[in-house]
Amino acid sequence: DKYDIRNKLVSHKTGELFFRAHEAVQNAHISEFDRQGHFIIDYILTELNKDRTLLLFISKNLAWGVFKGAFEEKMPDDEYNFYQSYLDMLAQSGLHYKNPELMLFTIIELVGSTCYSCILYQQPVSLAEYRPYLHRTISGIMETFLQDHTTCEVLSSDTKTHVDHTA
């Protein structure tokens, strides 16, 4: 049906965008996982800022299931798979993240929901003005998902207590 076709097209276009971002990060010879992630996000935002029609098309029809389909879709050489490349980058980093799929979902949802208005309407600020805040927030998300960081201090009125954030 037409929704199936639309979802496949969104998935394909999104997959192409991530494929080009992955090629660009490889060509930039960036090896640290967090820097790779920030580079890929910047690449995608720059491309969407240049092609607002693509942004409108993708964002109007994008749900996590469609997005995940884009990750699993094979790209031009039939060997590239974004989600597998993401997992490979994680493995090569030597860092251990708890629930890497949830971390990716959280970052994608943040970027998608906050950057749309910045790109299309420059609201509440332009994308250029927003980027530093976005990147600090993404770094915080990555820090939160690090395997070794499952507790944090919470200050109560009189004492310090630890809150366990393990799922």
Ranges and model annotations:
Residues 39, 43, 85, 133-137:
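Alpha-helical elements of Rossmann-like donor-binding domains used by nucleotide-donor carbohydrate transfer enzymes
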Residues 15-19, 53, 66-94, 101-105, ...:
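Amphipathic alpha-helical packing segments from all-alpha helical-bundle domains
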